[in-house]
Amino acid sequence: MKDKIINVIGLGYIGLPTAAILSQNGYRVYGTDINKDVVSIINEGKIHITEPGLQDIVHEVVKSGKLSAHNEPKLANIYMICVPTPLKEINNKFEPQLSFIESAIKSIKNLLKTGDMIILESTSPVGTTRFICDTLKKEGVDTANLNFA
């Protein structure tokens, strides 16, 4: 399993620690974030968030080549979506906004191949995996041979 390449999309409070720990455990991990400053900081072996012990781990895994950060997703076997799902008030109800998830999914559509796995780590409402499948289908991706978690 450790021969699988993982692409973590979203390098915030969930994505960066997840990417770092996976890298520390022997996986090759590409981290993707739209913020160029975040990518630069991580590639220097530093962190942009506060998390006890994370700085040392990120420094170690970047130096070893197990973790690198990019502004665009890279080819992988497993894509882990770790982007925000902010709430927006609509008709006096707070509704989760799936636009960041949609953008993340669209950013990997041309990289997906048979057997790949998409893991949604973002806090999201019931039906979000169906939303992901429907989005991919609308983008012309055959989802029959993809795995979702």
Language model features with spans:
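Conserved N-terminal Rossmann-fold NAD(P) cofactor-binding segment
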Residues: 2-5, 28, 34-78, 82-95, ...
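Glycine-rich Rossmann-fold phosphate-binding loop(s) that bind the pyrophosphate
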Residues: 11-12
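N-terminal Rossmann-fold NAD(P) dinucleotide-binding loop
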Residues: 15-16
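Rossmann-like NAD(P)(H) cofactor-binding subdomain of soluble oxidoreductases
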Residues: 87-149
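Extended hydrophobic secondary-structure segments
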Residues: 31-41, 117-126
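Gly/Ala-rich phosphate-binding loop of Rossmann-like dinucleotide-binding domains
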Residues: 19, 23-24
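A structural signal for isolated positions on well-ordered beta-strands in alpha/beta enzyme cores
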Residues: 7, 30, 68, 117, ...
